[in-house]
Amino acid sequence: MEDNPYGELRFEGEIQPSLKSMDTKGLVMFLGTFSKVFCPGLRLGWVAADKDVLSEFIKIKQSADLHTSNFDQGVADAYMDAYDLDAHVAKICDLYRHRRDLILQVMEEELPAGCTWTHPEGGLFLWLSMPEGVSARKVFNKCIEM
């Protein structure tokens, strides 16, 4: 199972190939979502899988919640008919790139010596490592104050 909610939110470098794109035996289920690129409150996703796997997945999904909201599906369908989703994704990638650059700048200026972090090329997260003796709770509380 490949869960890829942030795959389209790439703002640097090449888009990484999915495991599904390399799957020659039909073993990978690819899970995507509209909530990260379209509307956070719209809990609507999609699955790409082998036909036999998908039919079993549908049974499991139906036993879990009967069906996905028809209204939510209609909203997503109407949006994709009326607007260019790729252009929208490009726009939000620019926004997230700007936010990433800003947080990296603030971290460089404000965090204590010895802290290290990743430089994300996409998505919404980064990984911060702090030196021994630095309280993660105190850093967290300081961030909340800002």
Where are these regions (language model features)?
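PLP-dependent class I/II
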Residues: 1-146
